[in-house]
């Protein structure tokens, strides 16, 4: 299994603090059935800047350590890029990393809103052959209040990744319920851990897949995990036609 969003590289952001933490996370990932991780340290979020060369070097060093420790896990380079207006230009300058050098780019919104220029930026990126993958949209306040924002971005070609912990209920029942509504509306294309450590931000991969199978049957979790394989091969992912999210006041978000 492939995890496309994880903060396993040591001392690069708010994820693994050192190489010992990285090894501990690697062992936890393997226990969850994960064999490949795309390391996605935060980049340009106002706190962290992790340049491509540094990410590649850190991934190489961690892979050497994993071999030494006999841990059956391989780490690939990527970034979780906080959205900003010059993403397209900086990709052209090779100043940003896509996910393992594929056409897929992991883009993070601020947690409280969706920038108004996002739609135009995503359009421009797609003209250049890239596919923006929206990181954890379920945790964005404006999307929770107005999920049609996500619907319109997905309708126009973006993909999105939900966090395993959200589906597993780690962030609360309301966020779990909202996450399931996004899945139900065909607005989610990947499940990933966004793991930062093994104590407070663990993988929860198997829990999430269990929830998905219980709610929607076995075909959906298979499709979402297969999409990670397709991404890694730089191929077109599976998609179902997106639908508007059902408005249920029960969830407390709208």
Curated annotation (Swiss-Prot):
Give the pH-dependence text from the record: Optimally active at alkaline pHs. Activity increases with increasing pHs.
Cofactor(s) needed by this chain: Mn(2+)
Q: What class of enzyme is it?
A: hydrolase
Query: Which residues does UniProt assign to the signal peptide?
Result: none
Classification via Gene3D superfamilies: Metal-dependent hydrolases (3.20.20.140)
Q: Which domain of life is it from?
A: Bacteria
Q: Which cysteines are joined by disulfide bonds?
A: none
List the catalysed reactions: O-phospho-L-tyrosyl-[protein] + H2O = L-tyrosyl-[protein] + phosphate
- Alphabetical list of InterPro entries matching this protein: Caps_polysacc_synth_CpsB/CapC, Pol/histidinol_Pase-like
Activity regulation (record text): Inhibited by vanadate and sodium pyrophosphate. Not inhibited by sodium fluoride.
Outcome (variant: residue 3 to A):
Large decrease in activity
In short, the EC number is: 3.1.3.48
**UniProt keyword annotations, A-Z:** Hydrolase, Manganese, Protein phosphatase
A single MF term (Gene Ontology): protein tyrosine phosphatase activity
Family membership noted in the UniProt record: Belongs to the metallo-dependent hydrolases superfamily. CpsB/CapC family.
Q: PANTHER family this protein is in?
A: TYROSINE-PROTEIN PHOSPHATASE YWQE
Chain's role: Dephosphorylates the phosphotyrosine-containing proteins YwqD, YwqF and Ssb.
| Name the UniProt record assigns to this protein | Tyrosine-protein phosphatase YwqE
Name its species. Bacillus subtilis (strain 168)
Gene assigned in the entry:
ywqE
